[in-house]
């Protein structure tokens, strides 16, 4: 018999390489066929609920790394909750209406303006449904466990019907109204935009200082040769000027420059003088802003008057302190104009071109008018200064083109009547990171009314009829009737039925004596779609619960889904749709740049999966601090792959060395474990406690760091490092070996459970090698935290020993550098401890030679020799061990051949082999 045949060498079929791109797909197929999602929920019936509501991604194209970050984060949370005593369903959703779908059809040559509306919308539906299926396949491949057979999609009939009911309830409460006011207008999309659909970019613009001749100074300012000076970055709005706004609290200076006088805010005078180039000027008069109200000026180009009015939005940050006011082209302008009954003059059409309301500009694009106005003001002698100015300007988030403020007649949701209620609900919810609460609170506090109408085709129609005299018709009866039709036929019914067919049978109105009605042509803002999901999904669906426990999305959703959902939910029910909000940063490249095809830094999840596997993306998510922006590159993913290999290989070692361990037969009770094994069991238990607490805070980064640190330092670099001397060498069923196997097996089981939410495919593979009752680790529960009576004392003593171990390892390293020894097992170590350290070592009662991996260890009560290396609480002497290397245990021993029957072995190995392999004594032993 060969020596290796007398060793307990670990064996396992768990492969070193994961072959993840292939094996993951096999596991996912198995999960689907065995309905693991349904099985897990059935196990959790009757347990406390946890409802994470999925914010719907837009169905357009394959998923990107931002999608992966979001969906994997949600999956980790839901998997954890299900394994930790909660009934945690997860229904994935998709946002399917809106401009991107229309843009895709336009690229294919489909013209919405010439095609029948119902047929056009059917093409939109088909495209959107194809995109949903494409993304669903991508999300499944990430290993996301969800109710994939029953997703919610905003184009579903029942969803659209419930959205109509939400609108109807808000209308009934008086929160919906029709009005004309400036809104974000996208000429490139030919539609209004919500705040969440606008992104800001730095652009260059013409900034101009313009002189408006004073015509009436109310007897305070002499109008002769006197001018109000305004500053604007939108010269194209000058034709729509109706007023000049001043702050009543500011002082204004009348400044003599040559034979003319100019009025500017005193606090900006020096800055304005420098900008315009007034080298020689003199303040001849100071006037309070409050005294300037109702003064008048002449428009510098057109034959019209401009009224001086008051507004507290006027600041001393930029400009002149006198603000050009065009109520048809700005929100502040509109609001202040309402107080003075100023005309809402907005002579620009849906394409961004001037109308015949300004005949000479008819058909001109506003950006061309911008240049023309500069020239006209120059020709009129009213242009004091032209300067190119860089500022942050709103753009359409889809088309990337600039937007304008334009007064149009739209439908709005009024926020003011229930703003305080919304703010109160924000206070009651919790936010991760905590700054999210302040951010959302300030957004709601400062936001204006929500423009909910859109001039597009693909969306949920506004369920409004018009009577013969133009009166809007919305009643509880009409709303419910439309909702029921939509439940059966979908919202396309609005375009395939007449108004009469869509109204309740026999419906009449005093506003339509002839019984004639027409339908609203606009659709609802897509944010009203997703913003109603709390009702259409969480409130309405069986098995789900409202309000949701958690909303988790990117930080851009504070002005998007977090915002719109909150408004509709509080408007209808009085409460927030969520108890907690978790926001994440954006995915950037390793240099902090956004992903873009032009930069060539786009990383596709599907490409990563084909090369590395979804587990590597999942590990990347768990390693990242997602509360701020998250970096990704192939290099970063390679680091995640290295971490994965370390985890996998450690598990492989643990599985190999517990393959002959039956937890039901061989487990050693905690009180009977050796001291070092108790120490590791306690360390493992503390790790589980910390990981469960981190999971409860949705802090995957801490979970991963702590687990990886335990695997790398406590297991690989310590416990499993010296384990071979026991696991391989000792008798198979010896107490020391079974004690150590108990801990290693516990670590494998508990770490597999803890890591399942993060690495479900790999942990499922590992679970197949463990001897547990559950067929799948996902059907097991999270490990329970034990309470060990000797916890504190044990950790305290072992912490002291670990400090001593570090010092001894340094002494061994010194001996290695001095060529006294090669590897540590060649050493004979003598430790001279002080009294406290000696007491600690006696208390621990461990095999310290085994733990230090040396051939001989002596704990001496004698005084340390002068050449001993002084440590903090002991002295140490390292020498080369005397004797020969035992070919079985690889230790240097002086008792080789002590047993004549087994002359090549040391006494320890001879005893083990003779007792367990009696045939060896007869047949002899080969190397």
From Swiss-Prot:
- What does the cofactor section's free text say about binding? Binds 1 zinc ion per subunit.
GO BP terms:
isoleucyl-tRNA aminoacylation
Q: Does the keyword Phosphoprotein apply?
A: no
What are the entry keywords?
Aminoacyl-tRNA synthetase, ATP-binding, Cytoplasm, Ligase, Metal-binding, Nucleotide-binding, Protein biosynthesis, Zinc
Give the motif span ('HIGH' region).
57-67
Q: Which GO terms describe its cellular component?
A: cytosol
Positions annotated to bind L-isoleucyl-5'-AMP: 553
Identify the residues that bind ATP.
597
GO MF terms listed in the record are: aminoacyl-tRNA deacylase activity; ATP binding; isoleucine-tRNA ligase activity; tRNA binding; zinc ion binding
Locus of motif 'KMSKS' region: 594-598
Q: Which cofactor does it need?
A: Zn(2+)
What broad class of enzyme is this? ligase
Q: Which family does it belong to?
A: Belongs to the class-I aminoacyl-tRNA synthetase family. IleS type 1 subfamily.
Per the entry's comment, what about the domains?
Answer: IleRS has two distinct active sites: one for aminoacylation and one for editing. The misactivated valine is translocated from the active site to the editing site, which sterically excludes the correctly activated isoleucine. The single editing site contains two valyl binding pockets, one specific for each substrate (Val-AMP or Val-tRNA(Ile)).
Q: What is this protein called?
A: Isoleucine--tRNA ligase
State the encoding gene: ileS
């Amino acid at each position: 018999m060969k020596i290796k045949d007398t060793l307990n060498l670990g064996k396992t079929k768990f492969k070193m390489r994961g072959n993840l791109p292939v094996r993951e797909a096999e596991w996912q197929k198995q999960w689907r066929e065995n309905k693991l999602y349904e099985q897990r929920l059935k196990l959790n019936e009757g347990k406390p609920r946890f409802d994470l509501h999925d914010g719907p991604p837009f169905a357009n194209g394959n998923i990107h790394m931002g999608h992966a970050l979001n969906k994997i984060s949600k999956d980790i949370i839901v998997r954890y909750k299900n394994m930790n005593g909660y009934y945690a369903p997860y229904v994935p959703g998709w946002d399917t209406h809106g401009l991107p779908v229309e843009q895709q059809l336009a690229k294919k040559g489909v013209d919405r303006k010439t095609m029948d509306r119902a047929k056009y919308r059917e093409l939109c539906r088909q495209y959107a449904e194809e995109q949903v299926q494409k993304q669903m396949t991508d999300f499944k491949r990430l290993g996301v466990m969800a109710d994939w057979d029953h997703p919610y999609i905003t184009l579903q009939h029942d969803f659209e019907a419930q959205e109509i009911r939400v609108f109807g309830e808000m209308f009934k409460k008086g929160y919906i109204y029709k009005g004309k006011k400036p809104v974000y207008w996208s000429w490139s999309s030919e539609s209004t935009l919500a705040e969440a659909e606008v992104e800001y970019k730095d652009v260059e613009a013409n900034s101009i200082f313009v002189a408006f001749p004073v015509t009436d100074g109310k007897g305070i300012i002499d109008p002769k040769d006197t001018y109000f000076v305004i500053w604007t970055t939108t010269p194209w709005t000058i034709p729509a000027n109706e007023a000049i706004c001043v702050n009543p609290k500011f002082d204004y200076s009348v400044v003599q420059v040559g034979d003319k006088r100019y009025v500017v805010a005193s606090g900006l005078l020096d800055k304005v003088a420098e900008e315009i180039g007034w080298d020689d000027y003199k303040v001849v008069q100071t006037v309070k802003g409050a005294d300037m109200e109702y003064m008048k000026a002449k428009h510098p180009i057109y034959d019209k008057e401009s009224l001086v009015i008051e507004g507290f939005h006027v600041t001393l940050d930029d400009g002149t302190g006198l603000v050009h006011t065009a109520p048809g082209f700005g929100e502040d302008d509109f609001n202040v104009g309402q107080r003075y009954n100023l005309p809402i003059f907005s002579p620009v059409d849906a394409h961004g071109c001037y109308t015949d309301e300004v005949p000479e500009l008819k058909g001109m694009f506003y950006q061309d008018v911008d240049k023309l106005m500069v020239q006209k003001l120059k020709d009129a002698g009213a242009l004091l200064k032209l300067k190119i100015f860089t500022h942050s300007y709103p753009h359409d988030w889809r088309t990337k083109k600039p937007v304008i403020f334009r007064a149009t007649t739209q439908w709005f949701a009024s926020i003011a009547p229930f703003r305080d209620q919304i703010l109160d609900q924000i206070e009651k919810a919790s936010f991760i990171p905590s700054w999210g609460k302040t951010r959302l609170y300030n957004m709601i506090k400062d936001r204006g009314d929500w423009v909910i109408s859109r001039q597009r085709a693909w969306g949920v129609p506004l369920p409004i009829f018009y009577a013969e005299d133009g009166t809007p018709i919305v009643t509880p009866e009409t709303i419910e009737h439309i909702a029921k039709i939509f439940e059966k036929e979908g919202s396309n019914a609005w375009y395939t039925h007449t108004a009469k067919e869509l109204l309740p049978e026999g419906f009449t109105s005093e506003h339509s004596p002839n019984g004639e009605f027409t339908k609203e042509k606009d659709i609802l803002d897509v944010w009203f779609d997703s913003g109603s999901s709390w009702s259409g999904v969480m409130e309405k669906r069986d098995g789900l619960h409202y309000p949701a426990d958690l909303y988790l999305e990117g930080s851009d959703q504070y002005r998007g889904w977090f915002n719109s959902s909150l408004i509709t939910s509080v408007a209808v029910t009085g409460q927030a749709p969520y108890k907690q909000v978790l926001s994440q940063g954006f995915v950037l490249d390793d240099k902090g740049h956004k992903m873009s095809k032009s930069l060539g830094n786009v990383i596709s999840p599907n490409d990563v999966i084909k090369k590395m596997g979804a587990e590597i993306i999942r590990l990347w998510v768990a390693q990242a601090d997602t509360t701020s922006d998250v970096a990704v590159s192939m290099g970063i993913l390679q680091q995640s792959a290295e971490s994965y290999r370390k985890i996998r290989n450690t598990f492989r070692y643990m599985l190999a060395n517990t393959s002959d361990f039956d937890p039901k037969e061989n487990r050693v009770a905690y009180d009977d474990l050796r001291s070092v094994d108790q120490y590791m069991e306690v360390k493992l238990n503390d790790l589980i406690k910390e990981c469960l607490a981190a999971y409860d805070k949705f802090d995957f980064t801490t979970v991963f760091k702590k687990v990886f640190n335990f695997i790398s330092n406590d297991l690989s670099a310590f416990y499993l490092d010296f384990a071979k001397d026991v696991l391989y060498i000792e008798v198979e069923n010896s107490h020391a070996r079974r004690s150590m196997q108990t801990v290693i097996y516990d670590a494998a089981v508990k770490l597999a459970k803890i890591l399942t939410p993060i690495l479900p495919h790999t942990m499922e593979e590992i679970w197949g090698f463990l001897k547990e009752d559950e067929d799948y680790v996902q059907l097991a529960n999270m490990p329970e935290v034990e309470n060990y009576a000797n916890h504190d004392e044990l950790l305290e003593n072992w912490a002291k020993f670990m400090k001593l171990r570090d010092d001894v390892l340094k002494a061994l390293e010194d001996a290695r550098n001095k060529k006294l020894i090669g590897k540590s097992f060649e050493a004979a170590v003598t430790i001279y401890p002080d009294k406290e350290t000696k007491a600690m070592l006696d208390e621990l009662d461990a095999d310290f030679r085994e733990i230090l991996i040396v051939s001989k260890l002596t704990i001496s009560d004698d005084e340390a020799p002068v050449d001993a290396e002084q440590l903090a609480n002991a002295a140490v002497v390292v020498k080369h061990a005397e004797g020969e290397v035992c070919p079985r245990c690889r230790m240097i021993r002086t008792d080789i051949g002590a047993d004549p029957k087994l002359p090549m072995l040391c006494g320890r190995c001879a005893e083990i082999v003779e007792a367990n392999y009696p045939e060896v004594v007869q047949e002899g032993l080969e190397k």
